[in-house]
Swiss-Prot record:
Coiled coil: none annotated. GO terms for cellular component: large ribosomal subunit. This is Large ribosomal subunit protein uL2. SUPFAM superfamilies: Nucleic acid-binding proteins, Translation proteins SH3-like domain. Part of the 50S ribosomal subunit. Forms a bridge to the 30S subunit in the 70S ribosome. The keyword Ribosomal protein applies. The gene is rplB. It comes from Trichodesmium erythraeum (strain IMS101). One of the primary rRNA binding proteins. Required for association of the 30S and 50S subunits to form the 70S ribosome, for tRNA binding and peptide bond formation. It has been suggested to have peptidyltransferase activity; this is somewhat controversial. Makes several contacts with the 16S rRNA in the 70S ribosome.
């Protein structure tokens, strides 16, 4: 995957860059594996905004991706690599020997025509899914399950990769992309390899309109609103907040207040918390 940049013909193309889609081999999705997905626009079942800055965007068809990899010991041939508008990773179309077709996340290095499989006795090759107990230490994995049989929930974005670092009786310790080290049941499945489209993080949108195409609306500071709209609003000119600390639009403490529950069931499984992100730069620093 490469990145194509544009000359500054207009202000929006000055910093504009897109993927060259060199790895994509098919433009139209498989009709049996797509469905219409109603867009929530940040509302709940009562129509109340629960997540701000969502709405608009282009219409898209949802590709049904197989995160379970539960067709064990049945080889599948990689028929095509496709673009998925709902995620930043590419997806691979599989044709199983029994005639079924499924989408999976496209691992880096997986080519059209290769055969992959899943199961306890699957070979240690890119794209194959195995229980964590069968994966050697130091192996790169993605699409990791948290609950056996529930399907992969972690390490699913473009370029993401986790690593198996330790094994115990019933648990396997993996290092996540955030730097967190976490115990997962040894019977949970994971897929070998790293997610493809690793250059996605280097793409520059170039203009606000590309965020609107994604369904992301502008974020407005509370200090420039009216008092009826935000606790920070009002005053003459650039007025201070008027409180002991910043708060959310609903009056709860914000910016630094810890929101994680003190007694969380997964605390016993987290060996090392994720590294703190730097506020000054894009990168992170280890704690």
């Amino acid at each position: 995957m490469g990145i194509r940049s544009y000359r500054p013909y207009t202000p929006s193309t000055r910093e504009h860059s897109v993927s060259d889609f060199a790895e994509v081999t098919k433009s139209r999705p498989e009709k049996t594996l797509v469905k219409f997905r109603h867009r929530k626009k940040g509302r709940n079942n009562r129509g109340v905004v629960t997540c701000r800055h969502r709405g608009g965007g282009t219409k898209k068809l949802y590709r049904v991706v197989d995160f379970h990899r539960n067709k064990h010991n049945i080889p599948a041939k990689v028929a095509a690599i496709e673009y998925d508008p709902y995620r930043n990773a590419r997806i691979a179309l599989l044709h199983y020997q029994d005639g079924e077709k499924r989408y999976i996340l496209h691992p880096l290095g997986l080519k059209v025509g290769q055969l992959i499989t899943s199961g306890v006795n699957a070979p240690l090759e890119i794209g194959n899914a195995l229980p964590l107990s069968k994966i050697p230490l130091g192996t790169d994995v993605h699409n990791v399950e948290l609950v056996p049989g529930k399907g992969g929930q972690m390490v699913r974005s473009a370029g993401a990769v986790a690593q198996v670092v330790a094994k115990e009786d019933q648990y396997v310790t993996i290092k996540l992309p955030s730097g967190e080290r976490r115990k997962v049941r040894a019977s949970c499945y994971a897929t070998l390899g790293q997610i493809g489209n690793i250059e996605h993080r280097n793409i520059s949108l170039g203009k606000a309109g590309r965020n609107r195409w994604k369904g992301k609306r502008p974020t407005v500071r509370g200090s420039v609103m009216n008092p009826v709209d935000h606790p920070h609003g009002g005053g003459e000119g650039r007025a201070p907040v008027g409180r002991s600390g910043p708060v959310t639009p609903w009056g709860k403490p914000a910016l630094g207040m810890k929101t994680r529950k003190k007694k969380k069931q997964s605390d016993a499984l987290i060996v090392q918390r994720r590294r703190k992100s730097s506020k000054r730069g894009k990168g992170g620093r280890q704690s």
